[in-house]
UniProtKB/Swiss-Prot annotation:
HAMAP family: Oligoribonuclease. InterPro entries: Exonuclease_RNaseT/DNA_pol3, Oligoribonuclease, RNaseH-like_sf, RNaseH_sf. One of its GO terms (cellular component) is cytoplasm. The active site is at Y129. Its EC number is 3.1.15.-. Belongs to the oligoribonuclease family. It comes from the Bacteria. This is Oligoribonuclease. The gene is orn. Keywords: Cytoplasm, Exonuclease, Hydrolase, Nuclease.
Amino acid sequence: MAADANNLIWIDLEMTGLEPDVDRVIEIATLVTDQELNIIGQGPVIAIHQSDDVLAAMDDWNQKHHGESGLIDRVRASQMNEAQAVAQTIAFLEQYVPKGASPMCGNSVGQDRRFLNRYMRELEDYFHYRNLDVSTVKELVKRWSPETMAGFKKQNTHQALQDIQESIAELQYYRSKVFKI
């Protein structure tokens, strides 16, 4: 498949917390859609090894959710570091989207971009500087059409691949209910 500048890169990171100065990335997943939001490619879903000290520093919320999902065990067992995760992810993306063409797509991608900028700069540089943030649309719908919110429920698994799939489904829902284009 030839890379297409109209395709969209969807990304989600799971982190040990919300502060890039102290927390680390522990999982990354990517999907590519065409401009109509049809999934055309699934990238690698990678648990990124972090030390026991990094994992032990997680707050209770992260310990609970990442423990229950099995992510902490996957991170401990992983032999993949951040540089390897970046290389594998970019190798996947190059098949579908030229460098610099796609905005960063997902939910609260500003947070993901902060971590990419700190720990995975080469991957952050692969994206256009713009964001396609589903959480922005959600906040607008919540204020301007609150009745529409009841029609879409997220599972909130806090697993990177499932979170991206939900983000795409959520934008598809808003497109069908809110946007008349």
